[in-house]
Amino acid sequence: MYVINYNQKIKEMKRNLLVVTCLIFAFVIQAQTTEVKKNDIKLNFSGYLKNDYFWDTRQTVSAREGHFLLFPAPVDNDPDGKDINATPNFNFLSIQSRVRVDITGARALNADISGKLEADFFGQLNPNINLLRLRLAYINMNWGKTELRFGQDWIPMFITDCFPGTVSFNTGAPIQPFGRNPQIKVTQKFGKFKLIGILSSQRDYASRGDAGATGTYLRNSGAPEFTLQLHYKSVNKDAGTEFVTGIGASYKTIKPQIETGTGYKADATVGGMNGIAFLKYQANKFTVKIEGIYGENIADVLSIGGFLVSDSTNMIKGFVEYSPIKT
């Protein structure tokens, strides 16, 4: 009779696994050390600790416990004519504290490689406030006049060279489109001009529908959002001035549902065309910024918009047609 000692076998397996793990770890460390020496890769760690203390005279329409303020809540009178929303509110928060890692010094395919990883404690949704949230995570390949960036970055309609300077963290929302999403971005430079093409999806900032805010509607359309922009930037260091201007357009299609309420396959989609034009002039003592936005179904960028059912083509099967809300 042969008896298997399972405890002994498990101990031997653990020892073997530990040895293999140590060897792999040592190999990875050696490989990374060699790569750093070869390419002189540098990691720059940064971030900050931020505390916000605020008091509002009335209730607000906002996110993250009042931290991301949109606008004051409307008047809501009770039977006695007293405004329910005329109730003060305050909060103390540290959720904007941020950590960041910038990577430089690598080279591949004759390109300079850089990257950025940034996170805060804002949370993706109101229920998970105070939890770690990914903000930016991308790799950039630079060939001089051509750049390729892939990863999570600012949405195309948020121009980092020209956005509102505000006291509140909302940065101009819901008028100014705001958000970050996964994307593939190609930039071609022509002197002071830049031609930019972007394919983007949705993550934390997503379209809204019957299932709430989710990137599923865009993914089910089978195609990412496409953006094309032209930027111009001129900097005069001697005079201390900077001039930036540009235009852009994007188009996306979402599929609000793949099955009707009566169980039939749904193929209806809704498209949306967006446009932006911007200008900034900065001098030593003043800065002027002008921006114009046109949007169709832009609820995914924290702006006023969305879509609606414009027609019921088959009441029995539940087929409908959609139209975007224009902003």
Segments predicted by a language model, with ranges:
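Detector for outer-membrane/organellar transmembrane beta-barrel domains
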Residues: 228, 240-327
